[in-house]
Amino acid sequence: MNDQWYKHLIGARTIKTGIAIFLTAVFCMALDLTPIYAILTAVVTIEPTAKASLIKGYRRLPATVIGAGFAVLFTYLFGDQSPFTYALSATFTILFCTKLKLQVGTNVAVLTSLAMIPGIHDAYIFNFLSRTLTAIIGLVTSGLINFMVFPPKYYGQVEEKLSKTDALMYKLFYNRCQELILSRLQSDKSEKAYKNIFNLNNQVETLISYQRDELSYHKKKECDWKLLNQLTKRAYTNRLFITHLSNIIYLPKNTRVNFSGDEKMALLKISSSIKDIFYDGTFKREDDSVETLRSTIKALEISGENQIKSHILYEVLMIYRLLDSRYA
């Protein structure tokens, strides 16, 4: 806990950005170069992972060179007091970056291009080369800092978001079953809650991908990979749960489904046992209720009637099976 105190005060990424800016400025001043362009590059190069910094930095460098080149070209043609110089420099920089698939570097390329125009004067070649050099300094410094200083660890964030996802999933499943028991097949409230859970799980998967990238670029212990695999498996199960949950939320309009008393009781018991997982950490099996729903599905398959009802009960059993496997 003590080695992560900085995260509660300012954030590791913010600290790394500050260090990268400082060192970039030091290197540029030591070489008698204007540091502002290198600093712009350094700031945008700090990414969530070292891999992202390297990949995007590889594309930002040529984009910056393109921006500097157009700034010099149009300053030579129109001078640094013409609106055409600024407009054409920005336009052609964006155009070429897009055509060459260097979009990740477009922002810093345009900023560099526009910022350097007032200071070019007649030193066209010198300004072009110096801006290219400062961009390299910013990219390299920022990339190394991101790789070496405070390598990001997303385990805590992933576990926190997974726990939140679990709680919201179980609650929504319980509430949705209550709606189904009352024959409320359409529910804006459930749809809104589902979208929130879906977005939250996407955040989890993004953080997991970040952590996997970090582990591939740093030598880590086997326990780190083991923990990541456990979190990945848990997120995958949640993805399946969410998918099945969506299938009982988004139902055809103008559809009516009626459940018998035994079926309602089975839905109530299963949904209650799943909701209670968040409170006591255990999954209470409801074998009798499961068998009731299975019998109903078999009967509906034989008769070929009420496919929507069969579909709903099947999805409920699939969710039950997922959790039965997770807590086996």
UniProtKB/Swiss-Prot annotation:
Q: What is its main location?
A: membrane
Q: How does it sit in the membrane?
A: Multi-pass membrane protein
Keywords associated with the record: Cell membrane, Membrane, Transmembrane, Transmembrane helix
The disulfide bonds in this chain are: none
Coiled-coil region(s) at which residues? none
Which cellular component terms (GO) are annotated to the entry? plasma membrane
Q: What is this protein called?
A: UPF0421 protein SAV1889
